[in-house]
Structure formats: structure tokens, C-alpha cells
Regions:
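Acidic, Ser/Pro/Thr-rich low-complexity regulatory regions
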Residues: 1-122
């Protein structure tokens, strides 16, 4: 994933659908490799240090809630944010929201996503 594309999406300069189109094949390849070999690679290019804000996290969650971005793509984006040295969280609420999206053990329900969005509004 290109750092610049992820930041553009988080900042609202790239629509969720455009972001999904741009990274969809990469996400599918990673998920397929994980299913078939038990190992998938998450890669994000280097970029300037970016502080992930509550607005950024809300944009990611709202894209999932509004079905403008699949959970799989949002999950991959969250993995990229967490694994990259070029992203930092503005506060604990942002940290929790990104880790919520990163947890792919069970896809969250719409109610859980809405509750996570609400937490960022406090």
C-alpha cells in the first residue's frame, strides 16, 4: 500500500471507493496467500510521519459502516497503520479505534462499528 494513498483516504482527499479500487487487488492477494499458505504479507511504503487523528479513524469506520469500503480493506489499512513506523496515534481513543478495525478474528457488526464511531466523538 502506498503511504500517500492511505493518507489521502484518511484525510478525505480520496473517496473510499477509489481507495478500495486502488488497494483491492493487493488486499485480495494478501488474504488469498494467508488462506492458502497461512502467511500473508502486509506492505506499506515509507512516507512522512503522520498523526492519525480521531477524524481519520472516524473516516475509516464510517466508510465501513456506510458500506463504501469493505471490512477486509479497512482491516488491511489498519494493519498498515499499525505496522508502519510512519504513523502515530493522536490519543488512546484513536489507538483503540484502529486496533478495533485491525482485529479480524470476527468481523464487527454494524452496531459495533457505530459504537466505535461514537467513542471517537466523546
Amino acid at each position: 500500500m502506498e503511504h500517500a494513498s492511505l493518507v489521502a483516504f484518511l484525510e478525505g482527499k480520496l473517496a473510499p471507493e477509489q481507495f478500495g479500487d486502488e488497494v483491492g487487488a493487493e488486499v485480495s492477494a494478501c488474504n488469498q496467500a494467508f488462506r492458502s499458505k497461512g502467511l500473508g504479507y502486509i506492505v506499506v511504503s515509507d512516507g512522512p510521519c503522520t498523526i492519525v487523528t480521531r477524524d481519520h479513524a472516524k473516516r475509516l469506520l464510517e466508510a465501513v459502516a456506510d458500506q463504501r469500503l469493505t471490512f477486509q480493506i479497512a482491516n488491511y489499512a489498519a494493519d498498515c497503520i499499525i505496522m508502519s513506523d510512519d504513523f502515530e496515534f493522536a490519543d488512546d481513543a484513536v489507538n483503540e479505534a484502529i486496533y478495533f478495525v485491525e482485529d479480524d478474528s470476527v468481523a464487527p457488526t454494524l452496531e459495533e462499528v457505530r459504537a466505535a464511531i461514537e467513542q471517537l466523538s466523546r
